[in-house]
Amino acid sequence: MSRFDTLFANLKAKNEGAFVPFVTLCDPDFDRSFEIIETLIANGADALELGFPFSDPLLDGSVIQAANKRALDGGYSTDACFEMIAKIRSKYPEIPIGLLLCANLVFVPTQDVFFKRCAETGVDAVLIADVPVLAAEEFTQAAKKHGIQSVFICPPNADQATIERIARLTEGYTYLVSRAGVTSAENQAHAKNLDNLIESLKRSNSAPILQGFGIAKPEQVKEALALGCDGAISGSAIVKIIERNLDSQTQLLSELAKFVSVMKTATKS
């Protein structure tokens, strides 16, 4: 079983959901970013969803765009991100690691090289945000060749045919988008049909469902689980903690530890 498969099996046995934080690697710099990831794991993160800094992130709101800019302004590249992942994997051999990034990064220099580096450094799954499931075959084949699980987004307007295709192609976990738009901790509304989407995904035997977009409070984690999700992803709320504590790493890590601990506690019934 993959690390994600093992994680969800273990959580199910404990009647817990997954809490998965998202951060942009190398924000605000390499060493501080690694300490941030150590803090996430130490305080209950079940898995990691990691972004590579990119100049034109499509799905990201202003908070994560700023994180990308900080990392890029520091001179950090894809090479530094893979170096960081290798360091994470060395210290945490069991933690599932998923990447969330744009297709442009996968093609540099080639898909094959990218997924090979993922495998070599310890990545488990990759979600390419700007590749719709209808155009996925090329990427899933390249990922599978190197033992990397492909993850796809289920949008709130997905029809039954799309849901069935997502369920067939997605491995590791299914990323259920709470609402249309870009990432943001401010916009915490979710689509009214999420319960129907979740039911349809489960009927189609999808990979475990993680709800993302606008997850910033423990109540929202509980709500996601009550709807039938297997866990929740929180990104913008975490990156905002980083943003407002750039002048104090001690304060940043302290605030982050409290947030993650509270969010993880919300996954336990």
Swiss-Prot record:
GO cellular component: cytosol
Catalytic residue list: E49, D60
Keywords: Amino-acid biosynthesis, Aromatic amino acid biosynthesis, Lyase, Tryptophan biosynthesis
Gene3D superfamilies, alphabetized: Aldolase class I (3.20.20.70)
PROSITE patterns cross-referenced by the UniProt entry: TRP_SYNTHASE_ALPHA
Record CDD domains: Tryptophan_synthase_alpha
Family: Belongs to the TrpA family.
Name under which the protein is recorded: Tryptophan synthase alpha chain
Organism encoding this protein: Actinobacillus pleuropneumoniae serotype 3 (strain JL03)
Gene this chain is encoded by: trpA
